[in-house]
Amino acid sequence: MLIIPAIDLKDGACVRLRQGRMEDSTVFSDDPVSMAAKWVEGGCRRLHLVDLNGAFEGQPVNGEVVTAIAKRYPNLPIQIGGGIRSLETIEHYVKAGVSYVIIGTKAVKQPEFVAEACKAFPGKVIVGLDAKDGFVATDGWAEVSSVQVIDLAKRFEADGVSAIVYTDIAKDGMMQGCNVPFTKALAEATRIPVIASGGIHNLGDIKALLDAKAPGIIGAITGRAIYEGTLDVAEAQAFCDNYQG
């Protein structure tokens, strides 16, 4: 399982939100490229970037920062989400050296767009499903739909999606542990690999994901925990690599 540091971008700075609320943000660095360097030097094997302004505006806003990080680390897999709602945007990021684009809101509102994107950019598309009580949320989590996460995930199985990033909104940024039972249920219900996100606080939460014994869970995204020092990236990755269960 991969430990994937998150860099959330707002107005060019690296921030963390609590439960997706833009007004409840903490600035951790005004130099996201240096922050990326810190996690790379700490041994991370993939980075998770989110354009928070983009998620709310429906188009990239912090694209220059993303490009700068991708250029600095051409051999590091980078995934970017937030405001990706057109093939042009995907093409822009792929040309900039980004490995994966995460389609969120558009995947819920227009599921056929995912198939289109996978066809145009095979192996590059991840679907981001953010949920509250098992139902999918969209538009920077401002709206909760009547669509169930597992039902929607199954729709994408035939499209060639590389992974699903599953985030439990109630847990995100709260450092109270991630929703292991639902993450496991999602991983077992679909053939698409799942990346867990939201709520990871310490090594115990990483162990809980591994103890779930769901081979489909291939990664865990962590944000606030690594910024506030309750989780060490290198230690957590070593723990995953050596886990015997």
Curated annotation (Swiss-Prot):
One of its GO terms (molecular function) is 1-(5-phosphoribosyl)-5-[(5-phosphoribosylamino)methylideneamino]imidazole-4-carboxamide isomerase activity. GO terms for cellular component: cytoplasm. Its main location: cytoplasm. The active site is at D8 (proton acceptor), D130 (proton donor). It comes from the Bacteria. Pathway: Amino-acid biosynthesis; L-histidine biosynthesis; L-histidine from 5-phospho-alpha-D-ribose 1-diphosphate: step 4/9. GO terms for biological process: L-histidine biosynthetic process; L-tryptophan biosynthetic process. It is an enzyme of class 5 (isomerase). Signal peptide: none annotated. It catalyses: 1-(5-phospho-beta-D-ribosyl)-5-[(5-phospho-beta-D-ribosylamino)methylideneamino]imidazole-4-carboxamide = 5-[(5-phospho-1-deoxy-D-ribulos-1-ylimino)methylamino]-1-(5-phospho-beta-D-ribosyl)imidazole-4-carboxamide. It is found in: Cytoplasm. Its EC number is 5.3.1.16. Keywords: Amino-acid biosynthesis, Cytoplasm, Histidine biosynthesis, Isomerase. HAMAP family: HisA (MF_01014). Belongs to the HisA/HisF family. This is 1-(5-phosphoribosyl)-5-[(5-phosphoribosylamino)methylideneamino] imidazole-4-carboxamide isomerase. It comes from Pseudomonas putida (strain ATCC 47054 / DSM 6125 / CFBP 8728 / NCIMB 11950 / KT2440).
